[in-house]
Amino acid sequence: MKRHPFLPRREFLRAGMTLAAATLAPSTVLAQTELLTRPVPSTGVRLPIVGIGTNRFRSGDPAWTARLRDTLATFARLGGKVVDTAPSYGDSERTIGAILGETGLRDRLFLATKVDRDAIDDGRRRLEASFAALGTARLDLVQLHNLRGAGTLLPLLR
């Protein structure tokens, strides 16, 4: 019988069986029972320290949108909560709004967006457009994007 110079048959079989058995074991990556969280200072609500950014959550062909929907559903199923978006991320707010409407995930997520206008009226319109695009009456967090208009927009956000 000819022997392979690098891996004897017995070791090859042992490695193959070990690999096969490993696929039957629960994944340790997904086995984590609880995400690391921190409390929001003003409310005490605990949120995971890691969220999902949605700059690339833009509409495309139906297959791409299905992948985005699956990604967001998996994120929520594994305990993710914070979803961060912005009007400047193309049509990501509209895409996320459609996905939230289809999946019913809105109440399970902490939805954050941004505003970045110099004038208060422009900022108000930008926020109203975000509410409409996201298909929600509630935003959990509104951030100043790049601090643009901070002096005029802070009163609006309060």
Where on the chain are the PLM-derived regions?
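Conserved beta-strand positions
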Residues: 52, 85, 113, 141-144
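Residues at the C-termini of beta-strands that transition into short coil/loop
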Residues: 16, 115, 145
